[in-house]
A protein has these predicted regions:
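Local sequence-structure signature of Cys/Sec-based thiol-disulfide redox active-site neighborhoods
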Residues: 23-69
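Structural micro-motif
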Residues: 88-100
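Sec-dependent N-terminal signal peptides
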Residues: 3-13
């Protein structure tokens, strides 16, 4: 059993960090990606999920990020976005913020154990609640 676990660790870790470049934000792209307006000045009412990530804790990131529905997903390497990290008071990674119109609606912050503080079902439920509330 121990050998099987050791054999699977590299595959699990790889799948968790296999996020295409277009989903990664740094300080130069963060504000425009999460702001409440688009490049054309239109209101952007899409819900946005931002995961603050750290290389030292990549095993605890959101592996199922592709399954998020009705929201845009971005990942931020805290080493490459110190301004965003400071602005949103990110102390531990992973931390997941759910934003609407540029404002944080919900935050899931890791504790001292550095474990992902939520799961996909809770994130999706929060997204659905935020989207429903904004339909009125």
């Amino acid at each position: 059993m121990k050998n099987l676990i050791l054999l699977l660790i590299p595959f699990i870790t790889f799948s968790q960090v296999d996020v295409p470049d277009k989903y990664w934000l740094d300080d130069s792209s963060f504000d425009s990606a999460i702001s409440g307006t688009s490049a054309f000045g239109d209101d952007n009412t899409e819900t946005i999920v931002v995961e603050f990530w750290a290389k030292f804790n990549e095993a605890n990131c959101l592996a199922e990020w592709q399954e998020i529905k009705n929201a845009k997903y971005y990942r931020v390497d805290i080493a490459k976005a110190p301004k965003a990290k400071k602005e949103y008071r990110i102390r531990m990674a992973p931390t997941i913020l759910i934003l609407k119109n540029g404002s944080v609606e919900k935050a899931f912050k890791a504790g001292l154990d550095l474990l992902l503080p939520t799961d996909l079902a809770e994130i999706q439920e929060t997204i659905n609640e935020i989207n429903q509330a904004s339909n009125f």
